[in-house]
Swiss-Prot record:
It comes from Vibrio vulnificus (strain YJ016). This is Enolase. Binds a second Mg(2+) ion via substrate during catalysis. Disulfide bonds: none annotated. Catalyzes the reversible conversion of 2-phosphoglycerate (2-PG) into phosphoenolpyruvate (PEP). It is essential for the degradation of carbohydrates via glycolysis.
């Protein structure tokens, strides 16, 4: 009953108004899985390729008809008749057929959409929720946990049209006892932040990931207004709510000069100086996680950052590792960072994503499941976080349906699993157990 009978691709629209790939996989017995590929704005140079048409007369060159053609043509031809339950074989067929190092022939957007749709169809054929099927694929059947959310409530960098250089300022509702309570706490802080910003005369328009995107005097001020909002919501900063940042430092690194140029603050830093700048913020605020604190190619700087901060806080590699086991293995060997951000469109298939999570966990690194800035209503990452018991999730703020869809799916899953999926809070964050 799990034999593939049809594979279908279509062009749909993401949360930024750009096209993306949606795929359907149909099985014998009428089971169907449907999934859509997300899309990033601040992308690592070593990510798998997102195939775009380049026809400027259509969607400003961002159409995905070539990727759709691959889904409806070569990929469909290769997968019809195959067993959807064998996810590793399905993904291997597509990767081999593509034949490139970075999935540039079919596009990671095409391969991923089919990969995820296949997993959903297989789960349906087994009569189980996706998270349960993912746990089985992961070799951890029946082992679940609810992830601690990192909620991006102030957006800067490539995710907003403002003067804030650091891309994401996040809160983690660590005082919550359940995922549902964590979502409530996040929403309360978010609404109080709106009031704090308005009281200071700041704009409360939101960025790509649903966080506010005001022009601020400094990056430290972003943390200060969040601290005010946490207090106004009736919570204790550092006890009930902790802070996290995604610097996305590759976006303000001047490669030629070898400096970090924070135009919003009018400051420049060497790697070492920027590491000490971050260490200063960690001293001043209860920041427990920093992502991409340096440029993706600045491995010497990352080694210094890990020595300086790695035993105190979680240091997450996103552009640094791009969900790629080859790059992660090198990072583990060299003692670079202590956590990996997991974005399945960076690598382009579910099987390879699960391999990256396993490699990280086996090495004592944490794995943070993440959305992209260009999202859809697809909430697969919620099931991925629970099904791998990854422990942490980044899926934006408390506004925009493309973000909230993931929180709502997590609430549903928690309700279904009850005590089988504990919410471990701060214990999930590297260095905070």
């Amino acid at each position: 009953m799990s034999k593939i009978v049809k594979v279908l691709g279509r062009e749909i629209i993401d949360s930024r108004g750009n096209p993306t790939v949606e795929a359907e996989v149909h099985l014998e017995g009428g089971f169907v899985g449907m999934a859509a590929a997300p899309s990033g704005a601040s992308t690592g140079s070593r990510e798998a390729l997102e195939l775009r048409d380049g026809d400027k007369a259509r969607f400003l060159g961002k159409g995905v008809l070539k990727a759709i053609e691959a889904v409806n043509g070569a990929i469909a031809d290769a997968l019809v008749g195959k067993d959807a339950k064998d996810q590793a074989a399905i993904d291997a067929i597509m990767i081999e057929l593509d034949g490139t190092e970075n999935k540039s022939k079919f596009g990671a957007n095409a391969i991923l959409a089919v990969s995820l749709a296949n997993a959903k169809a297989a789960a349906a054929s087994k009569g189980m929720p996706l998270y349960e099927h993912i746990a089985e694929l992961n070799g951890t059947a029946g082992q679940f946990s609810m992830p601690l959310p990192m909620m991006n409530i102030i957006n800067g960098g490539e995710h907003a049209d403002n003067n804030v250089d650091i891309q994401e300022f996040m809160i983690q509702p660590v005082g919550a006892k359940t995922l549902k309570e964590a979502v409530r706490m996040g929403a309360e802080v978010f609404h109080n932040l709106a009031k704090v910003l308005k009281s200071k005369g700041y704009n409360t328009a939101v960025g790509d990931e649903g966080g506010f995107a005001p022009n601020l005097k400094s990056n430290a001020e972003a943390l200060e207004v969040i601290a005010e909002a946490v207090a106004a919501a009736g919570y204790v900063l550092g006890k009930d709510v902790t802070l996290a940042m995604d610097c996305a430092a590759s976006e303000f690194f001047d490669k030629e000069a070898g400096i970090y140029n924070m135009k919003g603050e009018g400051k420049t830093f060497t790697s070492e100086e920027f590491n000490h700048y971050l260490a200063g913020l960690v001293e001043q605020f209860p920041i427990v996680s920093i992502e991409d604190g340096l440029d993706e190619s600045d491995w010497a700087g990352f080694a210094h950052q890990t020595q300086l901060l790695g035993d105190k806080i979680q240091l997450v590699g996103d552009d640094l590792f791009v969900t790629n086991t080859k790059i992660l293995a090198e990072g583990i060997e060299k003692g670079i960072a202590n956590s990996i951000l997991i974005k399945f469109n960076q690598i382009g298939s579910l099987t390879e994503t699960l391999a990256a999570i396993k490699m990280a966990k086996d090495a004592g690194y944490t794995a943070v499941i993440s959305h992209r800035s260009g999202e859809t209503e697809d909430a697969t990452i919620a099931d991925l976080a629970v099904g791998t018991a990854a422990g942490q999730i980044k899926t934006g703020s408390m506004s925009r349906s493309d973000r909230v869809a993931k929180y709502n799916q997590l609430i549903r899953i928690e309700e279904a699993l009850g005590e089988r999926a504990p919410f471990n809070g701060l214990k999930e964050v590297k260095g905070q157990a």
